[in-house]
């Protein structure tokens, strides 16, 4: 029951900028009303993740067949990138996560979900790293659909589309658990989100911490406010909480190792 409540809570928070009502109330996609500052946006952090149960089967759409790439290691592709934003914000992606136009994510027609991809805008040389968690774009010549934040960061929003090169970043499955210090000098934290809206981050920190029964704190640097859960000393517990956070819609969350804080 707590899990259902947490899921609904995150949906409401993430959908704060989307229009009310049924699915895809907007006939045309558009950027958010408030211009985005990209200084605080971090690239997706590549890490090993098992492929999702949803969104990874071969499929047919509009008379075309699409086969999911089984071994994406070394995969590269060049073509047009587009972006999607407010119309889809707060709705489900192909693997059941919640689309957040402010996260560093993307859609691809055949890469396994999730995959991490370096995207380089060959028109201006800017690049970023995104996490693929959706399917698309289904327009001839387009190879990847970027979240609004990712597109803005490399200059795709302004032009609508751009020439890009994508390269898959492969992270092998860990064969050993995370090393532990002899003196237990290391701890783990989960970075959930970063934002310039301090009150929103504080509210989320309180709600998420309560619903996951986990300590939370906010660190602020240069008007960028980062929400963390932790610190934890147990690696298995940290991994379990990370999966819960991602299931709640924060697919860009990741684990950081820190030196133990003085009591």
Swiss-Prot record:
List the Gene3D superfamilies hit by this protein, alphabetically.
RlpA-like domain, Sporulation related repeat
Gene Ontology biological process terms from the UniProt entry = cell wall organization; peptidoglycan metabolic process
The way it spans or sits in the membrane comes to: Lipid-anchor
- Its name, as the record gives it, is Endolytic peptidoglycan transglycosylase RlpA
- Provide a Gene Ontology MF annotation, just one: peptidoglycan binding
Enzyme class, spelled out: lyase
Subcellular location(s): the record lists: Cell membrane
Tell me which InterPro entries the record gives.
RlpA, RlpA-like_DPBB, RlpA-like_sf, RplA, SPOR-like_dom, SPOR-like_sf
Q: What is the lineage of its organism?
A: Bacteria, Pseudomonadati, Pseudomonadota, Gammaproteobacteria, Vibrionales
Q: Where is the lipid attached (N-palmitoyl cysteine)?
A: 17
């Amino acid at each position: 029951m707590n899990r259902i409540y947490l899921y609904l809570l995150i949906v409401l928070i993430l959908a704060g900028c989307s229009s009310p009502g049924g699915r895809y109330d907007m006939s045309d996609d558009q950027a958010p009303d408030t211009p985005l500052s990209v200084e605080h946006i971090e690239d997706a952090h590549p890490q090993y993740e098992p492929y999702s149960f949803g969104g990874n089967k071969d499929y047919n759409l509009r008379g075309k067949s699409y086969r999911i790439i089984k071994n994406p290691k070394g995969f590269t592709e060049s073509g047009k990138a587009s972006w999607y934003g407010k119309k889809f914000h707060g709705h489900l992606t192909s693997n059941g996560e919640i689309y957040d136009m402010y996260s560093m994510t993307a859609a691809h027609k055949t890469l396994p979900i999730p995959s991490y991809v370096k995207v380089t805008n060959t028109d201006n040389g800017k690049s970023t790293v995104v996490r693929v968690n959706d399917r698309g774009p289904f327009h001839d010549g387009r190879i990847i659909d970027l979240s609004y934040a990712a597109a803005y960061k490399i200059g795709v929003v302004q032009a609508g589309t751009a020439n890009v090169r994508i390269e898959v970043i492969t992270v092998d499955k860990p064969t050993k658990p995370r090393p532990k210090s002899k003196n237990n000098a290391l701890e783990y934290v989960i970075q959930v989100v970063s934002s310039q809206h301090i009150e929103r981050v504080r509210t989320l920190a309180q709600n998420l911490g309560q619903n996951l029964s986990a300590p939370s704190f906010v660190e602020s640097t240069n008007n960028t406010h980062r929400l963390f859960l932790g610190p934890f000393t147990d690696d298995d517990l940290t991994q379990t909480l990370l999966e819960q956070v991602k299931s709640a819609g924060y697919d860009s969350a990741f684990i950081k190792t820190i030196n133990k804080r003085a009591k």
